[in-house]
C-alpha cells in the first residue's frame, strides 16, 4: 500500500532529483531543504546583507535582529532556559572541538574522558587528541548486542576520575537511541561534565535540554533540514562559564590592548569573527517550518517507513542489518558481497545511499567489517522511494551472486 509523504512538495529539491531519476535515501548525511529556508536565504541576500553586532545602520540592525531572533528560536526548540545558552558554531564538529579545547585547562594527567564505542569521529578525535596532549585516559564504553551502550558496564567504568562523559544520543550507523538518562545521572554524581552529540537525535522529535539534564548538547543545522555551515552548542549556564576561549578575533573581545585583552562571556565570546549570518537566519526559518508540522504525524510517518525498510531488508537472503535500528536508518551488509560493489550498482540505478565506514572506523572495525551500506530516511521520503531501493537492490544482488 502506497504511503505518501504529506510534506514532500515542501522540498523542491526532491522533485528536481526525481527529474534526474535519483532517489535520495541519505538524509543522515545531510537533508534536502524546505522552501521556507530557500525563501529566507533569498530574502536576506536580496534585501540587504550586513554584518551583525557591529553597526548602527539599518541593514546591520535588521541583520542583528534576525540573527538574535534565530538564537531565540533555537533556544525555544531545545527548551533551553535562556537564549544566552545557545552558541552558534560552524557545525557539530566545530562545537565538539570548542568543548575539547575549552575544557582542556580543567584536566590533568591521569584524569579520564569516557566516550562510547559507537562514536562518530567528530565525538572521538577531539577527545582522543586532548587525551594525548594532557596524558589522560580515554575510556571506551562497550556496546551490548543490540548496538546500545552496555549500561551495567558503563556504570562501572564511569568513576571518580571521570572528568568528561561525551556520548552520542542516536548512533549514525546503528540507529539506536542510547540510555542517556541513567548515564548522565551517574556521570553527574561522579562530578563529571556531560556532553551529548545530538547530530542525529535532534532530527527525530523535540529534545528538551532542561529534561535531558546534560551540561552540553551539540548539533548541526544541515541534518535538521537547515543550511550547512551552522552548528549549535547548548550549554548550561554554569557549564559555559567553565569554558576557556579558544578562538580569538572580532566581536568576542570586551577590551583589547597591545599586550592584554578581556573577552566576552557566552554566547558572543565563543563566536569570534563574522558568524554564518545567512545560515543562522535560515536555521530560524527552518525551525519555524518544522514547528508548523504535526509532530505526531511526522513521527508516525517516519516509524512506518522505517518498519517497511527493516521488513524488506529482513526478507532478503544474505542481508544482515547491523544492530537493532530504532529510528529512520538501517545499515546492512550482504554475505559474500563487498559494500562498495553493491553501492556502485545502487548508484548506477539512481539510488543515493551511503557506503563505507560512516565516519566511525573503530565501530566498524569492532564489528569485524570494512564498511556497510546505510539507508536513511527523511520526512520527505515515501514508500515508493523505499520500493525503488528494494528493486535496485534485488537487481544488484542478482548480478553479483
Curated annotation (Swiss-Prot):
It catalyses: (sulfur carrier)-H + L-cysteine = (sulfur carrier)-SH + L-alanine. Gene3D superfamilies: Aspartate Aminotransferase, domain 1 (3.90.1150.10), Type I PLP-dependent aspartate aminotransferase-like (Major domain) (3.40.640.10). It holds the Pfam family Aminotran_5. One of its GO terms (biological process) is cysteine metabolic process. GO terms for molecular function: cysteine desulfurase activity; pyridoxal phosphate binding. SUPFAM superfamilies: PLP-dependent transferases. Its EC number is 2.8.1.7. InterPro entries: Aminotrans_V_dom, Aminotrans_V_PyrdxlP_BS, Cys_dSase_SufS, PyrdxlP-dep_Trfase, PyrdxlP-dep_Trfase_major, PyrdxlP-dep_Trfase_small. Its cofactor is pyridoxal 5'-phosphate. Keywords: Pyridoxal phosphate, Transferase. The modification N6-(pyridoxal phosphate)lysine is found at residue 223. It comes from the Bacteria. Catalyzes the removal of elemental sulfur and selenium atoms from L-cysteine, L-cystine, L-selenocysteine, and L-selenocystine to produce L-alanine. Belongs to the class-V pyridoxal-phosphate-dependent aminotransferase family. Csd subfamily. This is Probable cysteine desulfurase.
Amino acid at each position: 500500500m502506497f504511503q505518501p509523504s504529506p510534506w514532500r512538495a515542501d522540498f523542491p529539491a526532491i522533485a528536481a532529483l526525481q527529474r534526474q531519476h535519483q532517489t535520495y535515501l541519505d538524509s543522515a548525511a545531510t537533508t534536502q531543504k524546505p522552501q521556507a529556508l530557500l525563501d529566507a536565504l533569498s530574502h536576506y541576500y536580496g534585501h540587504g546583507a550586513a554584518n551583525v553586532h557591529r553597526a548602527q545602520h539599518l541593514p546591520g540592525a535588521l541583520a542583528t535582529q534576525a540573527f538574535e531572533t534565530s538564537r531565540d528560536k533555537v533556544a525555544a526548540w531545545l527548551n533551553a532556559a535562556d537564549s544566552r545558552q545557545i552558541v552558534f558554531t560552524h557545525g557539530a564538529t566545530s562545537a565538539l572541538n570548542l568543548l575539547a579545547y575549552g575544557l582542556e585547562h580543567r584536566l590533568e594527567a591521569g584524569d579520564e574522558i569516557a566516550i562510547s564505542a559507537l562514536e562518530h569521529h567528530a565525538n572521538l578525535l577531539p577527545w582522543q587528541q586532548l587525551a594525548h596532549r594532557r596524558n589522560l585516559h580515554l575510556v571506551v564504553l562497550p556496546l551490548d548486542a543490540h548496538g546500545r551502550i552496555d549500561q551495567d558496564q558503563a556504570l562501572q567504568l564511569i568513576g571518580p576520575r571521570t572528568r568528561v562523559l561525551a556520548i552520542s544520543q542516536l548512533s549514525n550507523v546503528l540507529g539506536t537511541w542510547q540510555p542517556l538518562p541513567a548515564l548522565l545521572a551517574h556521570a553527574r554524581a561522579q562530578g563529571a561534565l556531560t556532553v551529548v552529540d545530538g547530530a542525529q537525535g535532534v532530527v527525530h522529535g523535540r529534545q528538551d535540554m532542561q529534561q535531558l539534564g546534560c551540561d552540553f548538547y551539540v548539533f548541526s543545522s544541515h541534518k535538521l533540514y537547515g543550511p550547512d555551515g551552522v552548528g549549535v552548542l547548548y550549554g548550561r549556564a554554569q557549564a559555559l562559564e567553565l569554558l576557556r576561549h579558544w578562538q580569538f578575533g572580532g566581536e568576542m573581545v570586551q577590551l583589547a590592548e597591545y599586550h592584554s585583552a578581556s573577552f566576552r562571556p557566552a554566547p558572543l565570546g565563543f563566536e569570534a569573527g563574522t558568524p554564518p549570518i545567512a545560515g543562522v537566519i535560515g536555521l530560524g526559518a527552518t525551525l519555524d517550518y518544522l514547528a508548523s508540522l504535526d509532530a505526531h504525524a511526522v513521527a508516525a510517518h517516519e516509524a512506518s517507513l522505517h518498519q517497511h525498510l527493516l521488513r524488506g531488508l529482513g526478507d532478503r537472503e544474505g542481508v544482515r542489518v547491523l544492530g537493532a535500528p530504532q529510528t529512520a536508518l538501517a545499515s546492512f551488509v550482504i554475505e559474500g558481497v563487498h559494500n562498495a560493489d553493491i553501492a556502485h550498482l545502487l548508484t548506477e540505478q539512481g539510488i543515493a545511499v551511503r557506503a563505507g565506514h560512516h565516519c566511525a572506523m573503530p565501530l566498524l572495525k569492532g564489528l569485524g567489517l570494512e564498511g556497510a551500506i546505510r539507508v536513511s530516511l527523511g520526512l520527505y521520503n515515501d514508500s515508493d522511494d523505499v520500493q525503488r531501493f528494494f528493486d535496485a537492490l534485488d537487481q544488484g544482488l542478482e548480478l553479483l551472486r
